[in-house]
Amino acid sequence: MNKTIANAKRLYRLKLNQTLPEYKRFLYNEVLHDKSQILGIYGSRGVGKSTMLLQILNEMDYKITQKLYISCDHPMFQDLSLFEFVDAFSQKGGEVIVIDEIHEAKNFQKEIKLIYDFLNIKVM
């Protein structure tokens, strides 16, 4: 699992190197200041959900080692237990994780419920 977390962090750093637009979506401040442990955002393709979440993750007051972005449509996450991955990240000091394309993950509803029930980490 350590190798998977290291690879996910590397991919996140690559994502951070991409230029994000300065424009903020109308939900930006509401999502940024939301205190819920689990926050889901859904909508049509191409409307800016992923971009907004990356902008928010960048602005959150956590060290880079405490936050992570993953996309479940990446082959690395195909057969991975989200609960086990998030648990391992949390044990390494993770405080917040953005899980994009979560519908691509196996049993994602059950995995999110387990994260909510047992882990102390913010998931968007």
List each language-model region with its residue ranges.
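Phosphate-binding site recognition
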Residues: 1-124
